[in-house]
Amino acid sequence: GPILGKVDVGGYYEYLGLNSGNGLNKHIMTYGASGAGKSRGFVKPFILKTAQLKQSMIIVDPKAEMAEQMSEYLREQGYVVKMFNLLNKDNSDGWNCLGEIDGNVDKVQNVAEVIIRNTSEDGQKADFWDKAEKNLLVALIHYVCTLKDPLTGELLPIQKRSLATIYDMLSSEGQKSLDAKMRSLPLDHPARAPYGIFKQAASNLWGNMFIGLGSRLNVFQNKLVKKITSYHEIDLELPGKQPCAYFCIISDQDSSLEFLSSLFFSLLFEKLSDYALKNGDERGRLPVEVNMVLDEFCNIGKILDFKKTISTVRSRGIHCQIIAQSAAQLADRYPINEWQEIVGNCDTQLMLGCNDQMTAEFISKRCGNITIRTTTSMAPQTPIFSPITRQVNGYKQSTSNATRPLMYPDEIEQMDNSECLILIRGQKPLKVM
């Protein structure tokens, strides 16, 4: 299994890893503040070990470091290597999310939900405008996915059926033009129902809804974003069939493209789970196990139903290695105890270092308490100015038991950068290097 750390045994190091068949799931939650060595200490060794096992890996790579250092090595090991590069788009393979739909109505709903949720203000509940814009988006996705060549009657090439196509329709066509297109569709066309619900709103609001949805998709003004989301070169089912290494390179500063990385992982989990059920072994597991190395997890965007996903994908042969800077960051992205459900589904937790009180207190409680023995001594006392020299209080010593945290929060914050804590369900905490 994955290497978690090393211990000094008589002058040489022994590496510690998870044994397979131990009854634990392979989800790992890793906490590490900036500079704590998450990439060097966890991600890179994990990639090397996974390559030995010939398992697939999907790696979030915030600075493109892992792609630069490991992609050639992985190709030499027989891996199919692809990059969905939202940082340096010139060097990206194409991935068109509408190419994953295959006429599935549920997938259309999921794509629309991810886009609306990741382009709304944090903490904002879905209101009238969100719901109306979502119905408009669902209708447009159905319409664009079924666009056909008027001469041959065949579906248009996938690069002409993309989210960029929807943005172009919103920016160049009026509501009357779109109305005419929707009326020309067959009565049983899947775009008609959501468009009909959208039109239940007062007609004087339609223009505002067009503008609102267009604003959510305005990243498609960028020609490179249009290009990498139009062509379809990344197969989301392939990692379950043969060893693949996909690098999703994101910006940890620009959040405007978060909905694309969230779409990538939301559909990836869904496609792999579906493939496992249809083509897996008798237990419904993938032929090739897939590891999701979710570095900078909180900057990927909100993955659809992630707390439910992480609790079910283990049985499909999909394992998540979540890496966050702090528990506070997790709680901000997945509030109201949702983050604790996610952490609770990880049987292994690593603490590489933190500098915030919430994470330190959380890990301190997870480490539990220990019993210590305290000895209290009282020396003999003689009054200073008394002419009588006899002892007033004799020497006393008492011993008692007390409890204290295995590690106080301040001790966790003061851990050396070369140390880490390993917390495994059913085992005592372990401090290693």
Name the predicted role of every residue range:
Residues 3-14, 19-320, 328, 333-336, ...:
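P-loop NTPase motor domains
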